[in-house]
């Protein structure tokens, strides 16, 4: 099955490119001949870390940083450990597989994911393998670390829990996916003992930490349109938890803020977001699918500022660094904006020109207290510092924090376990296959977009709010069950506890319910 999926992925990408080619995408906005020069940039070091991808990014890999070491995945399969001080190679290790995601760290281990679905944990000091295990499918998103466990959201829709100390599988849940998806996935987020992910159907799914039982299936957007590409509402941006606000964003759908405890919609705005978001001081920074930058007030969803200077320039996810919002583009330029008002402060050409084209930057920029880590499509990794005298800032990295739970301090190689060093892993539970369009056996008339557990249900309230320019028919029909597609999500709009016909048009409908836990009625 995994081999078949690896064959299908390039075909789907080809179909997606063909579909998008007919949508008359505008050309990239030309850069100004005389840009502002209010940003001061210093390249601290650069290091060749492989051959890159020939300027044709498919898997947008990016580095991570811990314990004064930069860990760099390469699409040629080689993992690097670099000194954060000068970029010198501390170690390198050939994993034998195409690395396709940003790695993550726990204790002394750094964990890499690959397009073949292989997870490899190596020692941060020397790159020696600690353990290796198989995930269900391609890994395009950074694995999530929480309390000695590793959670993955793979490209076939599966959500899997592993023991991070030895790689053993704890549980796995398979989920449906549409016929065409974006070549990326959202990372899981842990909240209230629940593993939450954004799905390719534009829904928020939640699973219990211990066993993977599904407790949440909350639609964020409904797909409209005639072609598979028009119907895409993938949630590929990582969800973010900031104070009481849980933020999700969908492609061709919406950005929404939910109450972290109840799931109640606090606000929702039409948007089309693919890349990750950044947050600082109560403001969410996003790059729309057309490369427009937009900042939102996290309390109200109101637009703080919009910046269209870089429209259609295929920019990376925005990051916050020293009061600046920084993005890179397909020609290898870094662009700098004032985080307070969106003013464009200048650009810097980071990557060299080749004889045929400019090597771009498509992977996630990584802000650290030492500088911004950048892995260019050419295969070179950089550490860059930047600031502007026009911007006053308090924190280098902003105030967004991720809860990683409580983790072990050291992981020993699986081949040579130390006595008492690794607790026996939980007995792996059987894989669960979840058909996200099916209702509970005991609740066939309940909301088809919500699946109940054995003891507690998550229900959408009857007074759901929705944002939709087209009126919805008042005629209710029950969702049809289908083993291969999520008809209750892709074919209709959920209102109260029924499914109604989808209104015509290509704009997605935003629909929100609660995921507050309570006994079923």
Swiss-Prot record:
Region Disordered: start-end pairs: 418-521
Recorded topology in the membrane: Lipid-anchor
Record Gene3D superfamilies: YVTN repeat-like/Quinoprotein amine dehydrogenase
Signal sequence region: 1-19
UniProt keyword Zinc present: no
SMART domains cross-referenced by the UniProt entry: PQQ
Subcellular location(s) of the protein: Cell outer membrane
Coiled-coil segments: none
Protein's GO biological process: Gram-negative-bacterium-type cell outer membrane assembly; protein insertion into membrane
Function: Part of the outer membrane protein assembly complex, which is involved in assembly and insertion of beta-barrel proteins into the outer membrane.
Name of the protein this chain belongs to: Outer membrane protein assembly factor BamB
Annotated source species: Francisella salina
């Amino acid at each position: 099955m995994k081999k078949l999926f690896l064959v299908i992925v390039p075909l789907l990408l080809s179909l997606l490119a063909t579909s998008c080619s007919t949508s008359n995408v505008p050309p990239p906005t030309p850069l100004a001949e005389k840009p502002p020069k209010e940003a001061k940039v210093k390249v601290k070091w650069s290091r060749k870390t492989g051959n890159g991808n020939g300027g044709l990014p498919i898997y947008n890999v990016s580095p991570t940083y811990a314990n004064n070491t930069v860990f760099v995945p390469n699409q040629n399969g080689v993992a690097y450990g670099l000194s954060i001080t000068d970029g010198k190679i501390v170690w390198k290790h050939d994993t034998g597989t195409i690395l396709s995601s940003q790695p993550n760290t726990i204790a002394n281990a750094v964990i890499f994911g690959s397009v073949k679905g292989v997870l490899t944990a190596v020692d941060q000091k020397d790159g020696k393998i600690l353990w290796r295990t198989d995930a269900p499918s391609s890994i395009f998103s950074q694995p999530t670390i929480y309390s000695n466990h590793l959670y993955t959201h793979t490209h076939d829709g599966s959500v899997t829990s592993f023991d991070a100390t030895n790689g053993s599988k704890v549980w796995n849940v398979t989920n449906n996916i549409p016929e065409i998806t974006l070549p990326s996935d959202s990372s899981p987020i842990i909240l209230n003992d629940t593993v939450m992910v954004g799905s390719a159907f534009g829904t928020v799914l939640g699973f219990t930490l211990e066993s993977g039982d599904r407790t949440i299936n909350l639609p964020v957007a409904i797909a409209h349109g005639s072609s598979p590409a028009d119907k895409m509402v993938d949630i590929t941006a990582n969800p973010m938890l900031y104070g009481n606000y849980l933020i999700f964003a969908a492609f061709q759908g919406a950005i929404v803020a939910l109450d972290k405890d109840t799931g109640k919609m606090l606000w929702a705005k039409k948007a089309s977001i693919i890349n990750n978001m950044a947050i600082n001081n109560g403001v969410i920074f996003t790059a729309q699918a057309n490369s427009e930058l937009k900042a939102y007030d996290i309390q109200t969803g109101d637009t703080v500022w919009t910046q269209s200077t870089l429209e259609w320039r295929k920019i990376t996810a925005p990051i916050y660094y020293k009061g600046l919002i920084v993005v890179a583009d397909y020609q290898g330029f870094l662009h700098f904006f004032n985080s307070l008002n969106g003013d464009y402060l200048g650009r810097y050409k980071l990557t060299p020109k080749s004889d045929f084209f400019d090597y771009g930057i498509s992977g996630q920029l990584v802000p650290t207290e030492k500088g911004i880590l950048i892995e260019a499509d050419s295969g070179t990794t950089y550490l860059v510092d930047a600031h502007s005298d026009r911007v006053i800032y308090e924190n280098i990295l902003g105030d967004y924090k991720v809860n990683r739970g409580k983790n072990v301090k050291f992981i020993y190689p699986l081949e040579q376990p130390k006595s008492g060093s690794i607790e026996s892993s939980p007995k792996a539970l059987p894989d669960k296959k979840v058909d996200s369009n099916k209702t509970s056996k005991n609740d066939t008339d309940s909301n088809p977009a919500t699946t109940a557990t054995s003891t507690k249900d998550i229900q959408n309230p009857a007074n759901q709010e929705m944002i939709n320019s087209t009126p919805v028919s008042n005629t209710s029909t029950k969702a049809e069950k289908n083993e291969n597609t999520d008809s209750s999500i892709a074919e209709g709009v959920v209102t109260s506890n029924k499914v109604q016909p989808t209104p015509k048009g290509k704009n997605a409908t935003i629909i929100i319910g609660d995921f507050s836990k309570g006994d079923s009625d």
